[in-house]
Each structure stands twice: as structure tokens, then as C-alpha cells.
Amino acid sequence: MAAKDVLFGSDARERMLRGVDILANAVKVTLGPKGRNVVIEKSFGAPRTTKDGVSVAKEIELADKFENMGAQMLREVASKTNDVAGDGTTTATVLAQSIVREGMKSVAAGMNPMDLKRGIDKAVAIVMDDIKASSTPVKDSSEVAQVGTISANGASDIGEMIAKAMDKVGKEGVITVEEAKSLETELDVVEGMQFDRGYLSPYFITDADKMQVEMEEPYILLFEKKLTSLQPMLPILEAVVQSSRPLLIIAEDVEGEALATLVVNKLRGGLKIAAVKAPGFGDRRKAMLEDLAILTGGQVISEDLGIKLETVTLDMLGSAKRVNITKDDTTIVDGVGDKAQIEARVTQIRRQSEETTSDYDREKLQERLAKLAGGVAVIKVGGATEIEVKEKKDRVDDALNATRAAVEEGIVPGGGVALLKASAKLAGLEGDNADQTQGIAIVARALQSPIRQIATNSGVEGSIVVGKVMENPSATFGFNAQTEEYGDMLAFGVIDPAKVVRTALQDAASVASLLITTEAAVADAPKEEGAGGGMPDMGGMGGMGGMGGMM
């Protein structure tokens, strides 16, 4: 086992604090509407420019092991906030730095770190309750747009685009962000249920220009096994032909004779038909077929349920207003399923997604939920250069997460005002002893740090801003750094999601408390390099002097 370096007490804390400061100082320049960019070197390709706090934090690795420990613990704050709320990472970093600095001063002055931690926890709990109580639900899409705009650092076009996407697909819908190849940023909305399986044969195509199959009011047969022969299906095919409506077959696979027969019938014009593979694999395929059955008002034809293909009747088939199939995707628009059954299925999937511990499963369940409940919107981020597109995509991701958080838990005044005003709740609050009271004071002071940093980044003296905002009794009065005006933050449209503010404080206090209560730090000792190791002794080459005679 490698030898270790161990530092104790103030030596350990000071070295870790240095790392905390390096990381926090790099991250906090990005805070607020007038925050600056950070340029990050990449081992390949062009450097990356970003204003996203967590992207900066993740890139920082320090040479000194003890400083790096401090920096990594602070990085954990940004990562955790990003995972839970998706935004507010810079705010969380600024809060954590302030709590750590003030806390370490108190420890150096001889106070008990554990009591300081208890005081900090007490204060944080009160502030969290205050933020929850003062948050207001998001009323309309203009507020969604404002939240998005603030998170995208004042880019109103991004805010409006996210609001439009949420209008289209609803709160349950999935909104994804992709890099576009063009200069413009655009919104693409897929209505209905779409899954990534295309037609099994190009002979099914009905629109040769667009290379896709279009079906109006088709019957939909959902079969969970492979179709190798059409013999068992003849009765249902006869019934469909007589109804003169198209038929879409969704099965595990359609192969060999079955596919050939379908294609021949399609080409002869007797049967309007198309076949696609069922989406997903294994158990997930069964679940998605069940979703499709509920959406289209049909039944999954499954041997497990004792239903054979020979006995299928028209009322077991699903139906939809329209189906579009390209070579990669199938989209079912306006399935005729029963609304109450769809609602029940949505509730069931939502419960599964809340209970699952696997992130992958949760993501897949969310996708299924969106396809059933709303739809899918894609924001395609464009720009002149790759660097610009990546930087903009970071901001769109943040804005999207912030708007989701706002819809979930409501909004509070932005610009650091909600935290600053909450600090008034801590005035006069006392702990069980003087050290706990000091812990409460540390949090009260830290709550000023976000608004101070926003002011500093816009070239205004932070303490003057804090003084002016605190003088005004209104809970929504603050400083708009974009225009450098004082007034009602909600009227200015400067709002933050309550969840983001709450998570930032919670995570900052949690990691900062750990740093304050650290009494020893252990790291790998630097390896001793042997002097000039590796090269053989060259003393034997002295004889080369004799080569003079060869010239």
C-alpha cells in the first residue's frame, strides 16, 4: 500500500479551503445576467466556452492532493444540485463557499464544529420552509418563458421556445435538446405516439416523394410473437378487406412467407397494408405493446392470454385517425383508446417511475409516459460555429431544467432575493448555546452571497445592493442586474424556481458542514523519484576518444 500524508486540524482545513476557493472563484464569475464565460481547454478539438457552473466545476482538478479534496467536495455540491434541480449550480457553489469560509473562521476561533453544524442545519430548515411557503404556482406560459429566460442568461428567445414546447406537449411531455446543423434554433413537435421502428419493406410506401407510408383511419393489429405464415390470419384479413380500411401490423417480426404475401397483396392493390416491428425488447416490448393497445383501443394478441390469431375479430384491433411510417419511425396520431383507461395507465407508469431506483428505468418510463400523455418536442439548437452551439445547448439544458422545476414546485423572486429576504427569518433566532447561534449567523450571512456576487459581476458594490434591498419591506423587492434598476422582481420577470433555490441551499449546507467538521485529511504521499533512474551507466563509452584515428 502506498504511503500517505496526513494533515490535522487547521492545517488540513486551510489546505482544503484553498481548493474550495479556487473552484468557487472560477465558477462564481458566471453568476447572474452579467456573469462572464469560462473557457475550458479540451484535449482534442477547440476549447469549450460555457456559463454553466457545473460544467466548470467538473473540469477542475488540482495538483495539490489536499487542495483537490476541498475542490472535489465543492464539486459534489454543484453535481448534486444539477442532478436534483438541473440548475442553480453556481448559486449552490457560492453559498457553500460562504458557509465554509465563515465556518472555518469560527472553528479557528475555538468554537465547537459540531454545534456550528447543528446551528447551520437549524437555520437551513427554517429558510427552506420559508421558501416553500413563499413560492407561487406557475400561472401561464409567460411565466414559464420568464423562468427559461433567466436560466438561459437573459436569452428571451430560448425562454419563449421552451414555453411554446411545454404548451404543445404538456407538463408530462418529453422535451429533448439536440444540436442542429443550421444557424437557427428551431422547435420540432411530434404529435401522437412515436416509436423508433420503420416499415419492414419499402414496398409498403404510399408516398414515394416523402418515402413514407401514410394511412388514414387504419386498423392496428398488435401481435407479440413473430409472424412467419399468414395462414392463421386469413379470417381477420378477409374482414379488414371487406371493411375497406387499411391495416397496420405491429409484431415482434414479420418474415419469410408472411412478409412476401403481404407485399404481393399490397402491390396488387387488394390490401392497403404495412408492417413494422414492435418497439423495445423483452419485458419492455410487452409493456409498450400494452401502451399501444390502450392508446388505440385494441388488444395485444398474445398466446399467454389464450388469444389465437385464428380467433381475432375486428373489435380486438386498435384504430387511430392517422399513421405515418418512415424508414426509421412510426407515428400514431389520435388513437381511439378510452380516455379513462389512458389516464389509469399514465398514473400506473408515473407510480412505477417514482418507485424505481434505476435511472435508466426511470428515463424509459418517463419516455413511455410522455408518449401516452403528451407528446415529444425537440429543440434543435443552431449557431455559427460548433463552440457557439455547445455553449448555447448548455444554456438551453439549464433553462429547460429550471422551467420543469418551476412547474413542479412554483416560483420565487429571482436574483438572489428569495434567499436574502429569508435571512430576515433568522434574525434574533438563537440556538441551544452560543456556538449554535453562531452557526445560524453563518447561514444568515451566506444567504447574502448570491445577490452580492450577482451585483459584483455587474460592476456594482454588493454591500450597497444588500443594504437597499433589505431596507424595503416588500418580499419581492430586489435589484435587476440586467438593467441595474431596483423594483419588484416579479414585475421585472426575474424569477427563479423554488425547487432550484431550495436544492442549492440544501446541498451547499450539507457539504459545507462536512468540510467545517473535518479534523484530519489523508492523501497519497508524493512518490519519491529516484535520481536519473532508467538510463544505464554510460561510463563504458570513454573508449570513443580512440575514434579520432578513424577520421
UniProtKB/Swiss-Prot annotation:
The enzyme's E.C. designation: 5.6.1.7
Quaternary state and interactors: Forms a cylinder of 14 subunits composed of two heptameric rings stacked back-to-back. Interacts with the co-chaperonin GroES.
Catalytic activity, as annotated: ATP + H2O + a folded polypeptide = ADP + phosphate + an unfolded polypeptide
Chain residues that bind ATP: T30, L31, G32, P33, K51, D87, G88, T89, T90, T91, G415, D496
Domain of life: Bacteria
Gene Ontology CC terms: cytoplasm
Family: Belongs to the chaperonin (HSP60) family.
Keyword vocabulary terms for this entry: ATP-binding, Chaperone, Cytoplasm, Isomerase, Nucleotide-binding
GO MF assignments: ATP binding; ATP-dependent protein folding chaperone; isomerase activity; unfolded protein binding
Gene this protein is translated from: groEL
Compartment(s) where it occurs, according to its Swiss-Prot or TrEMBL record: Cytoplasm
Cleaved signal peptide residues: none
Protein name: Chaperonin GroEL
InterPro entries: Chaperonin_Cpn60_CS, Cpn60/GroEL, Cpn60/GroEL/TCP-1, GroEL-like_apical_dom_sf, GROEL-like_equatorial_sf, TCP-1-like_intermed_sf
Keyword ATP-binding annotated: yes
Pfam family, one: Cpn60_TCP1
Function of the protein: Together with its co-chaperonin GroES, plays an essential role in assisting protein folding. The GroEL-GroES system forms a nano-cage that allows encapsulation of the non-native substrate proteins and provides a physical environment optimized to promote and accelerate protein folding.
Organism of provenance: Maricaulis maris (strain MCS10) (Caulobacter maris)
rRNA-binding found in the keyword field: no
Single GO biological process annotation from the record: protein refolding
Coiled coil regions, renumbered to chain: none
